[in-house]
Amino acid sequence: ANDNSDAQWGGVVLLGRAPVSDCNLTLVFNTTANPNANPQCEAQLEGTAVTTPYGGANSADNSGSMRFNQIRFSGFELEQGNELQSLTTGGTGSGTSLENIMSFNSSDDGVEFFGGTVNIRNLAVIGASDDSIDTDFGAQNFVDTALVVQRESTGDNVIELDSPDGPRTPINAIPQTRMFVNNFTFIQRSRESTSVVRARGAGALSLTNGVIDARNVCYRIDEAPTLAALIRIDAVVGACS
């Protein structure tokens, strides 16, 4: 392996029973105000050819702990749009502990949160070929202290936020995606990327205390409901086009 290697193996997957909005396995969606009201809402893991469900009704679900781990040269594509990231979490609950995690040269996303309520502290994503941090399926995440650096030859958004994401998911499916990122440095070097942060589908985003250095635009907010859902952008300095 060298500094441009990726897709040498699959990646790390953590699944749990915390709520997700996109029940693409059971199609039993939750549209009530209580995100824990629907234990039958399950989704199917990407990047695998066998049925691998996740999601449920336990926001505090515990999938264990990962601390001081480097995930290098990872990523696997089962088919177009069906891939494994360096770190994939699905319905992973807040009882799970993720600290001091590094993704290096993933062939897809660095980290993708499919629903769940897991938080992560001290995250570095270097050289992801797609999005560095991707969150969807109603994920409720706090990212505390993050460094993202793209390669020049590959990479899409630093953050991509969707809510809801699936084509069969109703727009009012609960939970709605919410992501909080505090203390961060984003360096967008990719010639293929058009924005640093992309949010859509009425997902809610908060960015505080950060620096953005980019070739292109800092923010792309799709649709009026997504702009209305924006929580805050506070104490963020950006050098963008």
Residue ranges and their predicted role:
Residues 1-129, 134-241:
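Extracellular beta-rich repeat passengers
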